Swiss-Prot record:
Pfam families: Arg_tRNA_synt_N, DALR_1, tRNA-synt_1d. Its EC number is 6.1.1.19. A motif ('HIGH' region) lies at residues 130-140. It is found in: Cytoplasm. GO terms for cellular component: cytoplasm. It comes from Staphylococcus haemolyticus (strain JCSC1435). This is Arginine--tRNA ligase. Monomer. InterPro entries: aa-tRNA-synth_I_CS (IPR001412), Arg-tRNA-ligase (IPR001278), Arg-tRNA-synth_N (IPR005148), Arg-tRNA-synth_N_sf (IPR036695), ArgRS_core (IPR035684), DALR_anticod-bd (IPR008909), Rossmann-like_a/b/a_fold (IPR014729), tRNAsynth_Ia_anticodon-bd (IPR009080). NCBIfam families: argS. Keywords: Aminoacyl-tRNA synthetase, ATP-binding, Cytoplasm, Ligase, Nucleotide-binding, Protein biosynthesis.
Length: 553
């Protein structure tokens, strides 16, 4: 339990004891102690007096006063308690208790902020899962940045996480890919009689694949149509996936599993899933098609599994895939999907309910659109016309760190304008530069201290830390583990980037307010330990969102 949680726990116990002592309630509701946004309202605050109004049948301020009158504050380092507004109880603490976070950070190093105990919960996190039909674009980039950061945060919070990419390599889009490659293949051989499919792919990468195959395997022109299509399907997927994997790896995004949709057909998983749903009585025939009774489970209508022509809908392999995820021993499934998948949420949840699986075990996060902005003008993108701004181009334009950080800064369910010019600025206006500069500045201070013979020590006299800005900085360091926990529980990586900005800001304010290296040897040792704790925290926080922490800039 981290320092903040210990204080909260102690305060809750003392508030509970006070309520019992004052005979305000027999069944005491949940007591919440929070950190106020405005420090003028104390270090911690609770609204329990207002919660108890109906039970105690008294004015909330009277209830608050009764709680305060019977409160033992000695165990929680409380130096002052006041009542504010309609009945908030605000606690002001002797902030020396916060200094315990300094040796904790120094001693734990890279593990600082991480949960000490496993939650014994298996999470399968599926993200990106772009069709292997072209380059990754800005929407995929956001999905990748958020997904990878979320995986890191969940692991730090004590969850067992499997990162998975679902390869859509069995649908009509792969046939269109193969036909598109075929057209470019014959064009490279001087044959323009093969028309591009209406839903074909016109990107430069398809032209390159066709030319490469024509150069290396011109004999494929003599294959039967069926054999050539089968070959181009596999070669196209392999080519696109190799490129996609490299782009993601360069973006510092890695997966534990690459799950092929085709495998669901080959190993009989789809047939077995259909048989199971039929056995359970949730399928029926109508209008020549096979349907699933998803409306029994809060979907707005039933869904087709097998069309009139005997082919599967996209929903069928998706159902088999999610049932497979559950059968692999995962407690929670998290899917990050594009904005165009909003209608999929209820039907996928309903499909799991048919197997007796609690649909709450499936969490689907819809990723909203990103607009690339340059000089105040939107940079348009169109994947199939070959004009898309790719992940590779974004990395080359602004750098991996800036791209990762910017794409994680906002809640994934909100639209986001990515300012390309701001991402490249070397100024305090650029969030990633501001955060990384704080880390580099600390490294410079530590180097200077070492040259003066001052080493980092975890047992300095921290009572010398009294400056208001230093205390604010300590509070931010102490909030690191609770922030990780909050970001994990709410599946919200942007909470961590917000925290990084606040921590960097708190450090810069401290640096501008007080000298780190002073004439007082003991105070200097304490300051050096403090800024090293900040360095460790910044390094670990940046790592969780896939960003480097440079030692110089």
């Amino acid at each position: 339990m981290n320092i903040i949680e210990k204080v909260k726990s102690t305060l809750i116990e003392e508030i509970k004891a006070s309520i019992e002592k004052a005979n305000l309630a027999e069944d005491i509701p949940e007591i919440k102690v929070e950190i106020p946004k405005d420090t003028k309202n104390g270090d911690y605050s609770t609204n329990i007096a207002m919660v108890l109004t109906k039970v105690a049948k008294r004015n909330p301020r009277e209830i608050a006063q009764a709680i305060v009158d019977n409160l033992d504050t000695s165990k929680a380092n409380v130096k002052q308690v006041d009542i504010a507004g309609p009945g908030f109880i605000n606690f002001y603490l002797d902030n020396q208790y916060l200094t315990a976070v300094i040796p904790e950070a120094i001693n734990k190093g890279d593990k600082f902020g991480c949960a000490e105990e496993s939650k014994n919960t298996n999470i399968l996190l599926e993200y990106v899962s772009a069709n292997p039909t072209g380059d990754l674009h800005i929407g995929h980039a956001r999905n990748a940045a958020v997904g990878d950061s979320l995986a890191n945060i969940l692991i730090a919070a004590g969850y067992n996480v499997t990162r998975e990419y679902y390869i859509n390599d069995a649908g009509n889009q792969i046939t269109n890919l193969a036909r598109s490659i075929e057209t470019r293949f014959f064009e490279a051989l001087g044959d323009t009689s093969h028309e591009m499919p209406a839903d074909g792919y016109n990107g430069k990468d398809i032209i390159e694949i066709g030319k490469d195959l024509a150069d290396k395997h011109p004999e494929m022109k003599d294959y039967s149509d069926e054999e050539r299509l089968k070959t181009f399907r596999q070669l196209g997927v392999d080519y696109e996936m190799d490129k996609l994997k490299k782009d993601l790896a360069d973006f510092n995004v890695h997966f534990d599993n690459w799950f092929s949709e085709t495998s669901l057909y080959e190993n009989g998983a789809i047939d077995n899933t259909l048989a199971k749903m039929n056995e359970l009585g949730y399928t029926y025939e109508a209008d020549g098609a096979t349907w699933l009774r998803t409306s029994d489970f809060k979907d707005d209508k039933d869904r087709v599994l097998i069309k009139k022509d005997g082919t599967y809908t996209y929903f069928t392999p998706d159902t088999a895939y999610h049932y497979n995820k559950i059968n692999r021993g995962n407690d929670i499934l998290i899917d990050l999907m594009g904005a165009d998948h909003h209608g999929y949420i209820n039907r996928l949840k309903a499909s799991l309910e048919t197997f007796g699986v609690d649909s709450n075990r499936l969490e689907i996060q819809i990723m909203q659109m990103v607009r690339l902005m340059q000089d105040g003008v939107e940079v348009k993108m169109s994947k199939r016309t070959g004009n898309a701004i790719t992940l590779r181009e974004i990395m080359d334009e602004v750098g991996i760190d800036a791209a990762r950080y910017f794409l994680t800064m906002r809640s994934p369910d909100s639209h986001f304008d990515f300012d390309l010019e701001l991402a490249k600025e070397k100024s305090q206006d650029n969030p990633i530069y501001y955060a990384q500069y704080a880390h580099a500045r600390i490294c410079s201070i530590l180097k200077q201290a070492k040259e003066q013979g001052v080493e980092v020590t975890a047992d300095a006299d921290f009572s010398t830390i009294t400056n208001e800005k230093a205390i604010d900085l300590l509070k931010k360091v102490a909030e690191f583990e609770p922030t990780i926990e909050s970001a994990a529980e709410n599946r919200a990586p942007h909470r961590l980037t917000n925290y990084i900005q606040d921590l960097a800001s708190a450090f810069h304010k401290f640096y501008n307010a007080e000298k780190v290296l002073t004439d007082d040897a003991e105070k200097t040792k304490a300051h050096i330990a403090l800024v090293d704790a900040v360095r460790i925290t910044l390094h670990n926080a940046l790592a969780l969102v896939g960003v480097s922490a440079p030692e110089s800039m």
